[in-house]
Amino acid sequence: LSKPTIAAVNGVAFAGGWMISQACDLCVASDTAKFAITEVKVGRGSPWAAPLIHMIPQRIFMEIVLTGKPISAQRAYEIGLVNRIAEPAALMDTALELAREVLEGAPLSVAAARETVMLSTEMGRAAAIDAGYEAHVTAYTSEDAQEGPLAFSQKRKPEWKGR
């Protein structure tokens, strides 16, 4: 996927549900949501959980996969798995507000920022910096790169064109 994705978790996200929420770029959860990687409880493996090492601390990751015990939305927020918590009735509004905040950014810059984050989890620091620079060249040389500072100086919202 080239566009940012947002998971909205209301209820339980166990096993495959966790996998889907983890695969998204951002995650909003209701305050009643629960998360668990339960594979050890049923004799299965969870190789899909490997990218968590780039999302949460190693010992917390280890506890989650070794015990299979659920964690609350609050705990998921504390360890960095969840970006925002909302009341169940406000979950979708909260997720949509986050989406609107992302959409306020220049499209090419948002895409480059997302690509930089993804690349930095796949390579070493020096290579990630080089790749990040390459990812941002298009954004820096775009019409939007001219529009952003101009709109700022004119105290107005930018009119992004995505080019």
Where are these regions (language model features)?
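Short alpha-helical scaffolding segments that buttress acidic/His motifs in well-ordered protein cores
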Residues: I64-V65, A113-T116, G132, F152
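CoA-thioester-processing core
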Residues: A8, F14-L66, E78-I79, T94, ...
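Acidic, divalent-metal-coordinating active-site segment for phosphoryl/phosphodiester hydrolysis
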Residues: G68-R75
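Interdomain hinge/lid region at the active-site interface
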Residues: T141-A145, A151
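Short aromatic/basic micro-patch
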Residues: M55, P70, I85
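Terminal peptide-recognition signature
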Residues: P4, S21, A76, A113, ...
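C-terminal long alpha-helix characteristic of the crotonase
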Residues: V28-A33, V82-D130, V137, E143, ...
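Conserved catalytic cysteine-centered active-site region
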Residues: L1-A7
